[in-house]
């Protein structure tokens, strides 16, 4: 089965997202777990989640994709920023268990002059601190466009992170085609005549 959807606003809750996606002709969606620029997440309403799960069953939804806030930087040079990343991860992964078995996508981070190897190590450290055996959510490392000191713009960097993660079965990759296009990893030529 083909699963298709779009990024949608979570401001009105899970059931509203599900209804909007059905209206759009989709059967999955992505959403931010909280304001994409950071901040606290809204409380999850169990009745809202139950309504969403009915919609998802009725319309044969695929897995949904929660997106971490853009401000999450797992390899920041400043410890307080890495603490924010770890705490946000922990909170979001706990909240994701309200809708078990889905995806949590995040931008790996920017090493900000520390070097790619240090960035990779710090990202793996955060992942090792937050991933648990009990969680049902798969965490996705998103491919990046290579702007500034972003980590994850090359597949080798993502692989290096994954190689350092202990609970590898809780981890995957989100191939952001816009990002890899921007980095020129995708080459499309005109068909020959």
Where are these regions (language model features)?
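Conserved functional loop/turn residues at catalytic and ligand-binding sites
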Residues: 25, 100, 192
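N-terminal pre-domain/capping segments
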Residues: 1-66, 72, 76-94
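Active-site acidic/histidine proton-transfer and metal-coordination neighborhood
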Residues: 74-172
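Short hydrophobic beta-strand that contains or immediately precedes a catalytic carboxylate
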Residues: 65, 173-175
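Residue-level detector of conserved catalytic or cofactor/ligand-binding positions
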Residues: 184-192
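Active-site beta-loop-alpha junctions enriched in small/polar residues
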Residues: 7-11, 34-36, 68-71, 109-111, ...
């Amino acid at each position: 089965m083909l699963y298709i959807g779009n990024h949608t606003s979570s401001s009105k809750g899970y059931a509203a997202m599900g209804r909007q996606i059905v209206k759009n002709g989709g059967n999955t969606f992505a959403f931010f777990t909280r304001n994409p620029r950071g901040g606290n997440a809204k409380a999850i309403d169990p009745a809202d989640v139950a309504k969403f799960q009915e919609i998802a069953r009725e319309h044969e939804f695929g897995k949904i994709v929660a997106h971490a806030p853009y401000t999450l930087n797992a390899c920041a040079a400043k410890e307080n920023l890495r603490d924010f990343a770890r705490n946000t991860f922990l909170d979001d992964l706990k909240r994701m268990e309200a809708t078990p078995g889905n995806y949590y996508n995040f931008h790996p981070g920017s090493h900000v002059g520390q070097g790619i190897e240090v960035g990779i190590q710090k990202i793996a450290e955060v992942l090792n601190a937050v991933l648990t055996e009990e969680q049902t959510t798969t965490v996705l490392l998103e491919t990046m466009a290579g702007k500034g000191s972003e980590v994850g713009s090359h597949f080798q960097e993502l692989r290096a992170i994954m190689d350092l993660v202990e609970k590898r079965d809780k981890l995957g990759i989100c191939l952001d085609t816009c990002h890899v296009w921007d980095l020129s990893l995708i080459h499309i030529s005109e068909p020959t005549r």
